[in-house]
Amino acid sequence: MIDQVDRGVHAASPSEGMLIFRRGVSGPSRERSAQRREQVVPKHVFVTGGVASSLGKGLTASSLGRLLKMRGLRVTMQKLDPYINVDPGTMNPFEHGEVFVTDDGGETDLDLGHYERFIDENLSRSSNATTGSIYQAVLAAERRGDYLGRTVQVIPHVTDEIKRRIQRLATDDVDVVITEVGGTVGDIEILPFLEAIRQFKNEVGRDNICYVHGTLVPFIGPSGEQKTKPTQHSVTELRSRGIQPDLIVCRSEEPIGDQLKRKISGQCDVDQKNVINAADVKNIYELPLILHDEGLDTQICEVLKIDAPLDLTPWRQLVARVEASTAPVRIGLIGKYVQLQDAYLSVVESLKHAGFHHGAKVEIVWIQAEDVEGLLADDRMTTLDGIVIPGGFGPRGIEGKIRAAEFARENLVPCLGLCLGMQVMTVEFARHVLGMEDANSTEFDLSTQHPVIDIMNDQRDVTDKGGTMRLGAYYAVLTPGTKVGNAYAEPVVSERHRHRYEFNSTYRSRFEEAGFICSGTSPDKRLVEFIELQDHPFWVATQAHPEFKSRPDRPHPLFRELIGAALARRALTESTSRSADRAASADAKS
């Protein structure tokens, strides 16, 4: 028996073929655990997809991760992306969506945001591997002579590198590694990944691996039927690559019945209890409970020979809190990429998390930055309770963002700026309060007389675009008694960054004399990391991306305070409106 005292659980010896985890166990066996821990082989779950992309494999994998964690297991997650880009850092937001930044500076797929929010673990750049990064490593090894003159081929060299990336996460402090394979079975670029995970079974043992395949069960309107044929063809394609799925997760608009499950079971050679239905849900945080009711985690534990009790209580409490969040609040998101809302996925989820905390249902009003002038003209901006100005790159839409920041400042509308949002709020203040009419960022105007935002010194000679920004977690020292300091309630905080430009500190004294507070700086005081206004309910911004650290049960402090201020503004507006109505009614009677 291997005791894991520090986790409060026990795990059985690999020779017994079963991992057994029990809560609340203590005893004098810490040394035995340390001596024999290396014998325990972490379990692996591979999640593939078929029929169509964007089926929600990432949410399925994330929900499974949460369910396994609630069984006391130590879980980590990974995304394998078949595209040839080295990472998504230079990809167009309209094509890829959000770039999720990890603490160690990895620019990764947005699914890692789902992973972190669901399993409540900080992941690293190792949790995202692309075809581009894998080929880059293989070619670098060839140039070094690591292959000793052999012909470099997809099999074994590329597949070996893929397996190395998977195995890299299987450390001593992990019980289960969940790996999502991006793309769709049948795509030509996914073939090396399928071959690698097929081979992986023979290397770690059948009892240590589980294949989960996600498919679509579409509803055909004219016939009024749910169709299983796409699932059958997808599984046939997967089996032709040497992989027999242990479980099939069927995405559908409406629940599927036992009759369809029996049909899929018979056609795809999977036990009926291993055919899992993932129908559409009202909110994504319900999904772990629904998948548990379908038996997803139970059947995976059976495949992997894991015996671990489940405690769903905390997650049920979270979902109950989500369902009870009904107080309306309208937040305007002033963005450059609002046509693809996934470009702001973590911002959206962070706003929702803050809403859960306050019992509020956040309505996000999507506003294209270039359209702000028209919205101001017809007063639609006045219906907002709060504003978020998120990050982005390039000059398009900047003047609209600046006008939104001005509107929020002048009308006392709570406003939170993120990364580029902090920069445009700085420019707005310089122009309209300090009188620097042509103030700008040198990203947008190299000839400005007042470069209140300028490129960082160590970025001036950088020419490559990929992976060269100020990336990852950096510390900031907060000013006590400020809105930011009070929100965090910590003197020093760590946030994730992704930028090349910064507040130009040569202007700092002029800003501060006018009530503009630099409420957080880098430990060496060289970089301004947080700003706020002294005489405003909430006009706050950060050079960081705090949205990457919010959790559904622990909203980020800045988003929490934004929603709190927005609710207060809404309550005041409604109270004022009622008072005006009563006064008008009294005047009419008199």
Please describe what each predicted stretch is.
Residues 20-21, 30-363, 369-386, 393-394, ...:
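Flexible phosphate-sensing "switch/lid" loops adjacent to ATP/NTP-binding sites
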Residues 58, 62-66, 380-475, 480-483, ...:
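Cysteine-nucleophile active-site neighborhood
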Residues 531-536:
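Active-site beta-strand termini and strand-to-loop segments that position acidic
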